[in-house]
């Protein structure tokens, strides 16, 4: 699997969307480096959480549109935290939770398929059920991270019961949409390296 991930990573971009995704990925990396010197440690930590997602989407050989969507979504999600958009714009939190969890659930589908945790059945319901389950799990983990940050790092993190449940519902709905889309469209490039 490592060889396939490396092969996908080093494959040169071939389409405009792939070039744009790589540019966004580079911006994410540079942004974290700049943040390390210019922003508080908590903001740098939040921004650095984008890096695994933006790199993994390239390494998995996702279709260019999904790769770009992953990159943009996680950067918007982290950036919204740093510049406090979640408090400033009502509903932004739920929208970002839905979209971000949706794209990450799509990534999870590819990882679970590549590692043979799930076996393609040909049934359209499989990616719907698996993506929704993965999205709900990711939402729960994220809410635990938020709680941990609030409890042990800074009380400026907004954590309430209603916010937590709302975020998880939005994430679950986003993952459900991702599963429906995955049941109808291929998530990976046809020419990607596989295990």
State each model region's role.
Residues 84-93, 140-176:
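Interfacial helix-loop-helix junctions of multi-pass membrane proteins
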Residues 183-194:
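Membrane-interface capping segments at transmembrane-helix boundaries
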């Amino acid at each position: 699997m490592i060889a396939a991930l490396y092969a996908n990573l080093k494959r040169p971009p071939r389409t405009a969307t792939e070039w744009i995704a790589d540019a966004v990925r580079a911006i994410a990396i540079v942004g974290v480096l700049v943040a390390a010197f210019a922003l508080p440690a908590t903001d740098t930590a939040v921004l650095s959480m984008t890096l695994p997602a933006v790199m993994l989407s390239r390494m998995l050989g996702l279709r260019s549109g999904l790769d770009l969507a992953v990159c943009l979504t996680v950067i918007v999600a982290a950036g919204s935290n740093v510049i406090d958009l979640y408090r400033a714009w009502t509903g932004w939190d739920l929208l970002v939770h839905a979209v971000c969890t949706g794209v990450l659930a799509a990534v999870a589908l590819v990882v679970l398929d590549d590692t043979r945790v799930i076996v393609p059945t040909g049934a359209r319901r499989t990616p719907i059920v698996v993506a929704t389950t993965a999205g709900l799990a990711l939402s729960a983990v994220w809410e635990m991270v938020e709680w941990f940050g609030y409890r042990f790092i800074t009380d400026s993190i907004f954590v309430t019961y209603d916010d937590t449940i709302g975020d998880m519902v939005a994430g679950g709905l986003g993952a459900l949409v991702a599963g429906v889309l995955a049941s109808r469209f291929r998530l990976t490039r046809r020419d990607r390296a596989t295990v």
